[in-house]
Curated annotation (Swiss-Prot):
Belongs to the HisA/HisF family. It catalyses: 1-(5-phospho-beta-D-ribosyl)-5-[(5-phospho-beta-D-ribosylamino)methylideneamino]imidazole-4-carboxamide = 5-[(5-phospho-1-deoxy-D-ribulos-1-ylimino)methylamino]-1-(5-phospho-beta-D-ribosyl)imidazole-4-carboxamide. PANTHER family: 1-(5-PHOSPHORIBOSYL)-5-[(5-PHOSPHORIBOSYLAMINO)METHYLIDENEAMINO] IMIDAZOLE-4-CARBOXAMIDE ISOMERASE. NCBIfam families: 1-(5-phosphoribosyl)-5-[(5-phosphoribosylamino)methylideneamino]imidazole-4-carboxamide isomerase, PRK13585.1. It comes from Geotalea daltonii (strain DSM 22248 / JCM 15807 / FRC-32). Its EC number is 5.3.1.16. One of its GO terms (biological process) is L-histidine biosynthetic process. This is 1-(5-phosphoribosyl)-5-[(5-phosphoribosylamino)methylideneamino] imidazole-4-carboxamide isomerase. The active site is at D8 (proton acceptor), D129 (proton donor).
Amino acid sequence: MIVIPAIDLKEGKCVRLEQGLMERDTVYSDDPAAQALVWEAKGAELLHIVDLDGAFAGEPKNRGAIEAIVKALKITTQLGGGIRDLATIEAYLGMGIGRVIIGTAAQRNPELVQEACRKFPGRIVVGIDAKNGMVAVQGWAEVTGVTAIDLAKKFEGFGVAAIVYTDISRDGMMKGPNIEATRNLAEAITIPVIASGGVSALRDIENLMAVEAAGISGAITGKAIYSGAIELSEAIALTRRGASC
């Protein structure tokens, strides 16, 4: 399991939201590329980027900041937010993004995921965001009647590289991830699951590592590394020690 730092972009700045609410944001950096370099220097292997404006608008909104991050880094990046069609996927991969995350469009149009996986093998990730176990879309503004597990099962056999699972009630709240829901999802499918939302202390990383065998390949952390609750290099060292045991 690896620890993945997150950069959430709003109006070209690096921010964190509470429970996905755009009005409850905290700006952590006016220079996202410089912030990305900090996380790379601390040992990150993969950077998670979210275009928050894009997620709400349904189209890319922070291309300049994203391109600056990609040009600055040597490590792999994965990007989500506002990716709704093959043309956008192709443009981002051409820019140098390592993997793209399809969220809302995956729920509404699973065929897009299948086609994207066929065209760009190993580079397509599905983002599933859930509130009380039910899938939320459109920048978390709309909760559907579909469970996270039922949606995830639709993508079995497509060649999806991973599923990023976010428990919205935990995101940005520093209350710890929903271990049970994450494990249940990972056990229900063969696709690797990346946990997101709520990681607030090294103990949370340890708790996820304890259920890693269920199929959990990574943990995304945002607010905790910006606030200093977690030292990213320590969290990375912890997972590397676990991998060598």
